[in-house]
């Protein structure tokens, strides 16, 4: 669904729940159980009294053997102080507030606690979890459908020039069903009135693989694959790029008035350079299986003058069905070996996580269908491969 207001772009891409028996459930954005689980976890994390935390620690405790553990894989790395503001943590003086973190770990044993983790190898203790919140989360985990929990295994890296952080495991699965994707393609003439204040000045430019409209100051382009691109000549000169908060406020209003946001979008990256703040978003969806876009499925560039100077949007995913024949999967070790030559970070940084998803890909030729293929996603350091 498309929504006018910017959705909850900082919610976790996935929530991993490790049960007492060692089995794991991996809940991705779009899953019905994800929504209820995230609501409960967010309630437990909101308003924590972190005092003068968060101190650095050597490693995050893996939790007691008989107690569940929750891991929240956040969509982007933000500073500790930014997550503290988003979750309304109570603190008089936050230590290590500038460290980048992208993961929250909640242990639910006798000493239930909240931790943060981020590349390259930073781990922080946040606070003890109050007993009421610990009980509520533990009860929620106990009541989850047992069918959500699957076996996982450790990576076998003996013959690879790759290392992994302690505790990294992968789903023990050999095949997944083929997927079929339906997307909503943009109509250039319907989009025209959203991007040009005076349509009488607009003329069309035909390209081999795209169609464009321009009024001399702005260009709106739709490619054969359905990618919509908007650019304006307005720049920001030598002024400083906007802060993340300023860029999000401007982007939220601008995109909301020009067709709206996919409901399942999350923030993937924010870069400030040359007087422009560049926001890149991903789409994470799916019901039976996780489905996600390539990074930058939506891009919004905001100038220092709080104007959107570039916008890019992939077609909206309407439906993904999984009725095809089972597809054999390559092993995670084979995926690492395949990725290593093109991603030297895998040899320099330990693997922090590895998971399976259906990756949305544009067609190779105009008029062909978008596809969603089972793909191993590898995270090492700040990089996803």
Name what the model sees in each region.
Residues 34, 41-45, 49, 53, ...:
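Short, non-transmembrane alpha-helical segments in secretory-pathway proteins
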Residues 124-128, 290-292, 318-326:
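A short, polar/proline- and glycine-enriched secondary-structure boundary/capping micro-motif
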Residues 187-232, 261-307, 314, 354-384:
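Exposed beta-strand-loop-beta-strand "reactive/processing" segments of non-cytosolic proteins
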Residues 303-333:
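Short helix-loop boundary/capping segments
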Residues 1-245:
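Preferential activation on post-signal-peptide N-terminal prodomains/segments
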Residues 98, 106, 273, 292, ...:
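A generic structural signal for short, solvent-exposed coil/turn residues
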């Amino acid at each position: 669904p498309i929504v006018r207001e910017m959705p909850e772009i900082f919610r976790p891409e996935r929530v991993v729940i490790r049960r007492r028996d060692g089995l794991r459930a991996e809940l991705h954005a779009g899953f019905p159980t994800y929504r209820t689980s995230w609501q409960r976890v967010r309630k437990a994390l909101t308003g924590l009294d972190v005092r003068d935390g968060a101190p650095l620690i050597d490693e995050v405790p893996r939790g007691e053997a008989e107690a569940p553990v929750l891991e929240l894989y956040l969509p982007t790395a933000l500073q500790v102080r930014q997550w503290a503001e988003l979750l309304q943590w109570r603190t008089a003086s936050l230590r290590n507030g500038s460290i980048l973190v992208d993961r929250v770990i909640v242990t639910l044993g006798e000493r239930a606690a909240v931790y943060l983790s981020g590349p390259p190898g930073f781990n922080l203790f946040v606070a003890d979890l109050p007993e009421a919140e610990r009980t509520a989360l533990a009860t929620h985990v106990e009541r989850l459908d047992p069918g959500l929990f699957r076996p996982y295994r450790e990576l076998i890296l003996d013959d690879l020039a790759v290392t992994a952080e302690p505790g990294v495991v992968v789903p023990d699965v050999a095949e997944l069903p083929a997927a079929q994707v339906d997307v909503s393609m943009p109509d250039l003439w319907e989009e025209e009135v959203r991007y040009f204040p005076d349509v009488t000045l607009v003329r069309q430019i035909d390209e081999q693989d795209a169609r464009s409209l321009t009024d001399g100051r702005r260009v709106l382009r739709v490619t054969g694959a359905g990618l919509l691109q908007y650019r304006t000549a307005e720049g920001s000169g030598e002024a400083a790029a906007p802060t993340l908060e300023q860029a999000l406020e401007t982007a939220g209003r601008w995109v909301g008035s020009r067709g709206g946001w996919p409901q399942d979008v999350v923030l993937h990256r924010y870069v400030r350079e040359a007087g422009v703040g560049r926001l890149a978003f991903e789409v994470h969806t799916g019901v039976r299986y996780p489905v996600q876009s390539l990074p930058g499925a939506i891009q919004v560039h905001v100038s220092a003058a709080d104007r959107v100077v570039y916008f890019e949007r992939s077609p909206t995913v309407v439906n993904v069905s999984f009725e095809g024949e089972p597809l054999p999967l390559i092993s995670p070790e084979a995926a690492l070996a395949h990725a290593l030559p093109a991603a030297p970070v895998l040899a320099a940084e330990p693997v922090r996580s590895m998971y399976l998803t259906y990756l949305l890909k544009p067609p190779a030729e105009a008029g062909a269908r978008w596809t969603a293929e089972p793909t191993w996603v590898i995270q090492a350091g700040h990089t996803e491969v």
